[in-house]
């Protein structure tokens, strides 16, 4: 996925059974992304299911519609369903792990109801995985597996929000790879072009200023098996951790620096 493919285009028209993970540190980015995903779905007449924390729902709702009564009407007609993520998660857990039968009843039943309402395709956004990963990665991956199982019998697209910093070296030591493998697509940052510039500069910092960094990056990308669809720049970061692990943290530190000091980047709306 090149820098010319934006997260906006990924979220505007997801295919059935597309399973997307979004990383974010700023709630505003989450609201923009979910607003895009949900808003486009509603405009196309699709049903939308949100399993969301109340504060995030309030922020997302403000981006969707200034007139709250319009959202209330969508909920009455069954085109929009909003569930509390913490309450939903509490209903699913048995001995600390998500239970398949309970998941099928709660989430499968909600997807069934959205489909039966006659609004065409279904889009779902969920935050239960992010709440769960703060205490148990194994339980988080199990919940992702249950979502994936449900997608084999139900036709819907899914966006999962993860409050993770893509430039934190700790998550690059296994967590990000596990999360990526559980999804079809990963949205690592707000600005793909900015990330591409940051990675290009970081490669030059680490591997030398001549033409070798670009050649090395191309070689890494040619041989790196991406766990999910992601921007080339993100794959170039992960590839270094696989092929030259001793330099991975230093590269990520330089990417972080260049991304956050890139004065060519436009301000987010």
Q: What is each PLM-predicted segment?
A:
Residues 1-269:
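Non-catalytic regulatory/interaction regions at protein termini and inter-domain linkers
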């Amino acid at each position: 996925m090149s820098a010319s493919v934006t997260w906006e285009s990924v979220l505007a028209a997801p295919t059935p059974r597309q399973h997307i993970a979004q990383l974010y540190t700023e709630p505003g980015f989450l609201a923009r992304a979910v607003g895009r995903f949900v808003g486009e779905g509603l405009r196309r007449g699709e049903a939308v299911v949100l399993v969301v924390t109340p504060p995030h729902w309030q922020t997302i709702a403000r981006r969707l519609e200034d007139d709250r009564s319009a959202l209330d009407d969508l909920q009455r007609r069954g085109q929009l369903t909003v569930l509390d993520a913490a309450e939903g998660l509490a209903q699913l857990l048995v001995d600390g792990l998500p239970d398949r039968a309970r998941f099928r009843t709660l989430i499968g039943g909600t997807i069934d109801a959205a489909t039966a309402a006659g609004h065409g395709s279904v889009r779902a956004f969920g935050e239960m995985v992010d709440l769960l990963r703060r205490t148990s990665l194994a339980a988080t991956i199990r919940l992702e597996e249950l979502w994936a199982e449900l997608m084999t019998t139900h036709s819907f697209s899914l966006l999962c929000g993860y409050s993770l910093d893509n430039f934190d070296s700790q998550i690059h030591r296994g967590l990000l790879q596990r999360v990526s493998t559980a999804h079809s697509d990963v949205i690592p940052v707000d600005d793909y072009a900015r990330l591409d510039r940051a990675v290009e500069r970081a490669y030059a910092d680490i591997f030398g200023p001549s033409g070798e960094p670009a050649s090395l990056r191309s070689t890494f990308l040619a041989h790196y098996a991406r766990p999910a669809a992601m921007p080339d720049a993100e794959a170039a970061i992960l590839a270094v951790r696989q092929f030259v692990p001793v330099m991975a943290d230093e590269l990520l530190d330089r990417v972080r620096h260049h991304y956050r000091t890139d004065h060519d980047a436009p301000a987010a709306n």
